Regions:
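Active-site neighborhoods and metal-handling regions in enzymes and metal-associated proteins
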Residues: 3-483
Length: 483
């Protein structure tokens, strides 16, 4: 039962109030951020509780990931301030009141929490306004990232005197680049956490394969695998996609009864108690046996997935991995009679995007789409790599050169989306590389996606998650039938 409406939701105890890693980790991260910037104040607001339907009944609290990275605290209502001129770091927030303690039990003071992450100075949340106003009056610049929550926009607007709808235009590109440069290269302790999340995701997908059979609902499987995520951490890392209609890329409707002959697509991941994420996708037959047509298409997607692991490593451009996966898919579809002509030319104009209208993947870490709130132009692209306007490539979240320590996903797929197929045929799209008469035979096929998580290493890459969920057609069939 939530506390009554008079109880401040922002004071409620969270699952992980203590620091995530040791204090030296956070001291070193903040020091590294100081070193990348000069002059002014860096404002890093944490998240507040977000009401579901009343102030006392909130959604599960999720701290802002950049605040977590530099301050490591999972308490609502906190903000961090880095003074780039003096080198001082300050944590702003409020101590629990007696009313809070009655409802949540004893909680550490703000000063105690600050000590766990190596911050020597704390001040009340109300004092942050005075600190910002004093800095602005002296003409000092305030560096901040674009806020993505309504509550944070409102707070930032009040603190900075900038209209909420204009905050993004005042956000600091210099700070964005600095934060991305630090967060995108994962530390060993972070990789261990991501491995835990991947191990949990593997359990989720294996359970789904064992449960899957005609006659049960998608919801039954969704509930079971999300329970596994909660048993082993903080729950799912994003709303699970559990569907026998894989042609809908982000399908969150769980009401269908599973039918023999359909393919089940599950895109689901876990989040650890320390908020590190995983993201796997598997596609398998509802009745435990692939048809010949399903196997043919599945093996093309698996070959594209395998090709990305052959390529990935330091200095490889991610857009090249996408293009190579696209070539494998195009050549495979040509072998089935769905595409025709020179496939290099076809991929050059994006004809394969009819079947894979999304990019190959994304970075992953404290966010499942890591740092996406900061902006893809910083996370996925840079001065060296600009986004393409070609179909397929235009949807690629990341194209830039990979570095050792990156954690990325690879998720090629083939989908037969009736509305998209009709549009392309009606408008004469595809450059003559699509055999629409043959494609129409697949309108009831659905979709297939295979997604794994990988770490970029000095020598190339390695798959994360230990015991990889079954991925070959033979392995899936054996596992689903008790093997």
């Amino acid at each position: 039962m939530p506390p009554p409406s008079g109880t401040p939701a922002a004071r409620r105890k969270t699952s992980t109030e203590k620091a995530m890693f040791d204090k030296q980790t956070y001291i070193a991260r903040r020091k590294a951020l100081h070193a990348k910037l000069s002059g002014g104040l860096v404002l890093l607001p944490g998240n507040d509780e977000s009401p579901a339907n009343s102030p006392g009944n909130t959604f599960r609290f999720r701290q802002d990931s950049t605040f977590l990275y530099f301050f490591g605290l999972n308490r609502p209502g906190c903000s961090g301030l880095l003074d780039l001129d003096s080198g001082e770091d300050v944590l702003f927030g409020d101590d629990p009141t007696l009313e809070d303690i009655i409802w949540t039990g004893p909680q550490p003071s703000l000063a105690e929490l600050a000590g766990e992450v190596g911050v020597e100075k704390t001040q009340s949340a109300a004092h942050l306004q005075k600190r910002i106003e004093a800095a602005v009056a002296k003409g000092r610049r305030i560096l901040f990232l674009p806020p993505y929550r309504g509550e944070t926009r409102s707070t930032m607007s009040r603190l900075l005197g900038i209209r909420a709808d204009r905050l993004a235009s005042y956000a600091s590109a210099e700070l964005a680049r600095a934060v991305v440069a630090l967060r995108e290269v994962k530390e060993p302790a972070e990789i261990e956490e991501i491995e835990r999340a991947c191990e949990t995701a593997g359990k989720m997908h294996r359970l789904a394969m064992r449960m899957c059979r005609p006659g049960i609902t998608e919801r039954e499987i969704a509930g079971a695998i999300e329970g596994v995520a909660l048993q082993h951490g903080a729950g799912v890392s994003f709303p699970s996609i559990v569907t026998q209609h894989g042609e809908t890329l982000h399908n969150h409707d769980y009401d269908h009864v599973l039918q023999s002959g359909r393919l089940m697509l599950i895109d689901a991941g876990a989040e650890t108690a320390m908020n590190y994420c995983s993201d796997f996708t598997r596609t398998f037959p509802v009745n435990g046996r692939f048809t010949g047509r399903q196997k043919d298409v599945y093996d093309i997607v698996l070959a594209a997935n395998d090709r990305t692991f052959e390529l990935a490593g330091p200095d490889t451009f991610y857009y090249r991995m996408h293009n190579e996966a696209s070539m494998v898919i195009a050549e495979g579809l040509k072998s089935l009679g769905l595409m025709r002509g020179n496939m290099q030319d076809a991929v050059g104009v994006g004809a394969q995007a009819l079947f894979m209208p999304h990019g190959l993947g994304h970075q992953m870490g404290l966010d499942v789409h890591d740092m996406e709130n900061i902006g893809e132009k910083y996370v996925g692209y840079d001065e060296e790599t600009l986004r393409s306007s070609t179909p397929g490539l235009s949807s690629l979240r990341m194209g830039k050169r990979l570095k050792e320590g990156f954690v990325i996903t690879v998720e090629p797929g083939i989908y037969f989306i009736p509305a998209l197929i009709a549009k392309w045929e009606r408008e004469g799209l595809g450059g003559g590389f699509i055999d629409f008469e043959k494609v129409r035979e697949y309108l009831d096929f659905g979709g297939i996606r295979i997604e794994d998580d990988m770490l970029i290493t000095y020598y190339g890459n390695r798959m994360l998650g230990g015991n990889r969920p079954p991925v070959t057609t033979a392995g899936i069939e054996a596992y689903m039938n008790g093997g």
